[in-house]
């Protein structure tokens, strides 16, 4: 019996040794070395945000569009929807309520519109933010203009450059005309007069700067652009003050300047000088044009030609249907009341893209004026959703918009497919300015060969992980462990993110992994597509130089003193020659004298 027990013990010992050797050999394999976070950040401290940190950074708002459209449980936190989470079977939106710009990056087909933009527009409507969207296909206004107006009480405006006869209007002189009318009704209202002059200067500067640079970039030619800006300001004020309704638009400004370039009957004076000479010496239009009026004749012709060259782009019979009638875009209304503006850009006709750039520049500058009058900040947040901004030509002064608008409670959300699009349109420095001014970046879903994934992988940073090596001798295998750095997410991992999964980076916080569901799963539904009534080609009325001149004489000639000498005598002593009065003007002057 004892030998049997000894054999059993020996067998158990033998199998134990074999098992131990097997376990030891398994331990000393490369598969046993796991890439887990170790150390104290010796090679990088990058990590994803915890649930607690996410809750502290973002406001969690129950996402209930069905109730919102009935006017129930409307959210009060204004901001951008950057993620979602489910809790107790209920969907919550993660909202960044800070004053931020947000850069959205994703390849074509990743779901930028269906997963990100639609939930954001619905939320913007629910919390009452005014917003503007750019769109190349027209889907945004067809799906949301009607909902915003019907359920949320928004004023909506659609500027459709693809179908100008099915578009709302955008008269660039609207605010100038508005405040000029207030001043003409009450000449003691100096505030209205000042605002008319301010918006005239903004419009002129926007047009002259439409080439993407300001006058300081033109070197020796800077005078001509500065003077052309003054001439445009003066012409805009003349149109607003002396033309009847229906003729006060930007095309009339072009026609007036062109008419004033015609030769006059007075030697050494052109029509522009003679027209402004009929204004009182204290009239601001005369002052704005002073640089051009007090220069040599050839230089003045160059100034007027510079102004005309900037206005040439507006000469389009289709665009006139948008530019020459009532406006649907009002910066003051946009800032103070719930307003949605949809800009439709035709991909097949890039000659009209400059209008989008001008609308954005002018609206931005006018928003700054409203903000400054309100203590430097808007009461109601405003958001610009620039969808497909990478596929259209450069939006002039975009870098300036990103740099200065955030503190005014104006958020911009550019949506691009790759960094290469920004570099192409805005150059390396311009792209860096835009990227650096975006406090939030949301990205996911990249093409297999995307270089943007490499850039974003690097921007996420590195973490410290365990690595090691195995060496095996004849009898004694050994293992060596080290700490190395590893990207928080490699480019390959970013490229393989499932659709609807995104990474959100925010200034001052750790990045967040989140999901943005398809708009249908957010509870968003669309109704009948929004349509604008077809407007037949309307006849455009233009300003007339003779009409403006007669109106100036009617208002101001009674205040002018009679010249003491004849034009010929004044010419001999070097004085300014006077314009011969037409029969109509003589009758008008006689009437005015009789009335006196």
Question: What are these regions, as identified by a protein language model?
Answer:
Residues 42, 324-329, 473-480:
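A glycine-rich phosphate-binding loop feature that marks nucleotide/adenosyl-phosphate handling sites
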Residues 51, 55, 467, 476, ...:
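General helical structural elements
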Residues 1-110, 114-122, 127, 165, ...:
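Basic- and hydrophobic-enriched, low-structure N-terminal and domain-boundary segments
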Residues 43, 47, 482, 582-585:
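General helical secondary-structure elements
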Residues 402-503:
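Conserved ATP-driven motor cores of ASCE-family P-loop NTPases powering translocation/secretion/packaging/pilus
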Residues 81-89, 93-410, 425-428, 492-513, ...:
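P-loop NTPase motor domains
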């Amino acid at each position: 019996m004892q030998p049997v027990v000894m054999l059993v013990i020996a067998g158990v010992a033998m199998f134990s040794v074999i098992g131990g050797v097997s376990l030891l050999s398994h331990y000393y394999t490369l598969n046993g070395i796991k890439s887990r976070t170790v150390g104290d950040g010796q090679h990088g401290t990058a990590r994803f945000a915890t649930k607690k940190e996410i809750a502290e950074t973002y406001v969690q708002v129950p996402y209930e569009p069905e109730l919102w459209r009935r006017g129930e449980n409307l959210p009060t936190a204004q901001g951008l929807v950057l993620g979602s989470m489910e809790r107790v079977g209920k969907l919550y939106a993660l909202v960044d309520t800070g004053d931020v710009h947000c850069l959205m990056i994703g390849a074509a087909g990743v779901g930028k519109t269906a997963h990100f933009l639609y939930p954001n527009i619905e939320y913007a409507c629910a919390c009452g933010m005014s917003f503007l969207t750019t769109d190349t296909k027209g889907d945004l206004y067809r799906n949301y203009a009607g909902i915003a107006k019907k359920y949320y009480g928004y004023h909506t405006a659609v500027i459709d450059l693809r179908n100008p006869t099915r578009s709302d209007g955008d008269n660039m002189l609207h605010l100038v005309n508005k405040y000029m009318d207030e001043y003409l009704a009450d000449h003691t209202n100096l505030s209205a007069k000042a605002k008319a002059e301010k918006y005239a200067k903004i419009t002129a500067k926007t047009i002259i700067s439409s080439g993407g640079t300001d006058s300081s970039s033109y070197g020796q030619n800077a005078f001509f652009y500065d003077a052309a800006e003054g001439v445009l300001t003066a012409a805009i004020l003349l149109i607003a003050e002396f033309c009847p309704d229906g003729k006060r638009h930007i095309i009339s400004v072009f026609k007036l300047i062109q008419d004033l370039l015609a030769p006059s009957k007075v030697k050494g004076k052109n029509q522009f000088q003679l027209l402004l000479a009929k204004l009182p010496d204290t009239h601001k239009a005369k002052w704005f044009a002073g640089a051009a009026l007090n220069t040599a004749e050839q230089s003045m012709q160059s100034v007027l030609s510079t102004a005309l060259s900037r206005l040439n782009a507006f000469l389009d019979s289709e665009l006139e249907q948008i530019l020459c009638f009532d406006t649907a875009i009002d910066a003051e209304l946009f800032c103070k009341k719930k307003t949605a503006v949809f800009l439709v850009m035709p991909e097949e006709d890039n000659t009209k893209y400059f209008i989008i750039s001008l609308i954005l520049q002018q609206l931005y500058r006018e928003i700054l004026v409203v903000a400054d009058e309100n203590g430097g900040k808007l009461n109601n947040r405003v958001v610009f959703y620039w969808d497909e901004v990478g596929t259209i030509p450069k939006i002039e002064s975009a870098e300036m918009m990103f740099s200065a608008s955030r503190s005014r409670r104006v958020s911009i959300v550019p949506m691009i497919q790759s960094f290469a699009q920004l570099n192409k349109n805005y150059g390396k420095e311009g792209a860096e300015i835009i990227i650096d001014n975006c406090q939030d970046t949301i990205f996911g879903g990249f093409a297999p060969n995307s270089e943007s994934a490499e850039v974003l992988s690097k921007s996420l940073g590195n973490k410290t992980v365990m690595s090691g090596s195995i060496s095996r001798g004849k009898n004694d295998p050994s293992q060596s462990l080290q700490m190395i750095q590893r990207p928080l997410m490699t480019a390959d991992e970013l490229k393989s993110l499932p659709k609807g999964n995104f990474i959100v980076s925010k200034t001052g916080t750790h990045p967040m992994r989140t999901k943005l569901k398809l708009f249908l799963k957010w509870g968003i539904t669309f109704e009948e597509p929004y349509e604008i009534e077809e407007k037949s080609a309307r006849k455009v009325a233009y300003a007339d130089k003779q009409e403006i001149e007669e109106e100036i004489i009617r208002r101001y000639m009674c205040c002018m003193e009679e010249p003491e000498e004849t034009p010929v005598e004044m010419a001999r002593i070097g004085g300014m020659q006077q314009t011969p009065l037409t029969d109509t003007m003589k009758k008008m002057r006689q009437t005015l004298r009789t009335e006196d």
